[in-house]
Design a protein with these regions (language model features):
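Loop-to-helix transition at the N-terminal end of transmembrane alpha-helices
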Residues: 1-9
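Membrane-embedded catalytic scaffold of the fatty acid hydroxylase/desaturase
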Residues: 12, 17-155
């Protein structure tokens, strides 16, 4: 299960950095990225844009579980349980960052980290639940760094 949580956290970072902020050359491609994630940046406080629609989550989850089970057998299902737990935690944390009063030092840190991505520079702070990935990949934005430039208009 722990391996599944770690796998989720890396998946979350990679998807957010490379897929959700992908700059595609065609109008169709830009529209696809906008519908997938850009609309969340247009209105980050809209509760309907803070979590994935269930049909998308269920479809992706089924495909990921099938791949893990095929590759690892029964261990793949255990890995997937940790992965899906990570996803549920991610959705709850992400929703709370935008919509709920947060309590506790960790939640305040996660909120601050994520909101720098929205209100500072979109080129950093891609991790929502595991900020260490931004440090590992050099995309961490401190308050000073995030305030040092305007948000991108194309994401």
């Amino acid at each position: 299960m722990l391996a599944g949580l770690l796998t989720w956290s890396l998946f979350e970072y990679v998807m957010h950095r490379y897929l959700f902020h992908l700059a595609l050359p065609t109008e169709w491609g830009r529209r696809f990225v906008f519908l997938m994630h850009g609309n969340h940046h247009d209105d980050p406080d809209d509760p309907w844009r803070s979590i994935m629609p269930p049909i998308v989550s269920v479809t992706w989850s089924g495909a990921i579980w099938a791949a893990m089970a095929w590759a690892l057998g029964g261990a793949g299902t255990v890995l997937f349980l940790g992965f899906i737990l990570g996803y549920v935690v991610y959705d709850a944390v992400h929703f709370a960052c935008h919509r709920l009063p947060v309590r506790g030092r960790l939640m305040r840190m996660l909120r601050r980290h994520h909101l720098r991505h929205h209100h500072g520079r979109e080129e950093g702070n891609y991790a929502i639940t595991a900020m260490f990935w931004d440090h590992v990949f050099g995309t961490y934005l401190s308050a000073k760094k995030a305030a040092g430039s305007a948000p991108r208009a194309d994401a």
